């Protein structure tokens, strides 16, 4: 049977429990028509790139489906009817990924970065004040040291 990756986005107002119920409902439709869900991943509540149906965030869920095309057609029909589902996308694949998807690996990597803690000073270059190698306000090459600034009155008088 053909293999599919199916992702749907549920409204931000829906609770995690409601999203799990939606996933169970969709899985039931798939299995009722002779298909099989090999993997389910809930990516959680994530920000959308742009607003969809007045929503700025959505719950993302991915299903790996092994079943005939009639299963996908029925699942998509059910999702068009359901008001809690904002968008969906089904892609036919040659084989399913083993292990976690790219989105789950990214979430794990981000969590590891947060666990490391922040750097002192907050920036990549650290504190740039008072480094000692820039006397007089920066490297001037062959131009020599800076001369003192003149007042506006003195500058105007010297021009005349």
From Swiss-Prot:
Keyword Magnesium appears in the UniProt entry:
no
What is this organism's lineage?
A: Bacteria, Pseudomonadati, Pseudomonadota, Alphaproteobacteria, Hyphomicrobiales
Report which residue ranges the record marks as coiled coil.
none
Q: Show the NCBIfam families listed in the entry.
A: S6
Protein role = Binds together with bS18 to 16S ribosomal RNA.
BP terms from Gene Ontology: translation
Q: What is this protein called?
A: Small ribosomal subunit protein bS6
Pfam families reported for this sequence: Ribosomal_S6 (PF01250)
Q: Which HAMAP family match?
A: Ribosomal_bS6 (MF_00360)
Any single Gene Ontology cellular-component annotation:
cytosolic small ribosomal subunit
Q: Which family does it belong to?
A: Belongs to the bacterial ribosomal protein bS6 family.
- Region Disordered: list its residue ranges: 94-160
Q: Which organism is it from?
A: Rhodopseudomonas palustris (strain BisB5)
Q: Which UniProt keywords apply?
A: Ribonucleoprotein, Ribosomal protein, RNA-binding, rRNA-binding
Composition bias (Basic and acidic residues) maps to 94-119, 125-152
Protein encoded by which gene: rpsF
MF annotations from Gene Ontology: small ribosomal subunit rRNA binding; structural constituent of ribosome
List the SUPFAM superfamilies hit by this protein, alphabetically.
Ribosomal protein S6 (SSF54995)
């Amino acid at each position: 049977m053909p293999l599919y990756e199916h992702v749907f986005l549920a409204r931000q107002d829906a609770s995690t429990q409601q999203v799990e119920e939606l996933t169970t409902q969709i899985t039931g439709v798939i299995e009722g028509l002779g298909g099989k869900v090999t993997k389910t991943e809930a990516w959680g509540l994530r920000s959308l790139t742009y607003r969809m149906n007045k929503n700025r965030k959505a719950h993302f869920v991915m299903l790996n489906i092994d079943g005939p095309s009639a299963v996908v057609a029925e699942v998509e029909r059910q999702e068009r009817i359901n008001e809690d589902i904002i968008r969906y996308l089904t892609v036919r694949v040659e084989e399913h990924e083993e292990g976690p998807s790219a989105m789950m690996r990214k979430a794990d990597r981000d969590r590891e970065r947060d666990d490391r803690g922040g750097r002192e000073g907050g920036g990549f270059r650290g504190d740039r004040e008072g480094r000692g190698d820039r006397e007089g306000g920066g490297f001037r090459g062959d131009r020599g040291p800076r001369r003192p600034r003149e007042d506006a009155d003195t500058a105007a008088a010297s021009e005349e």
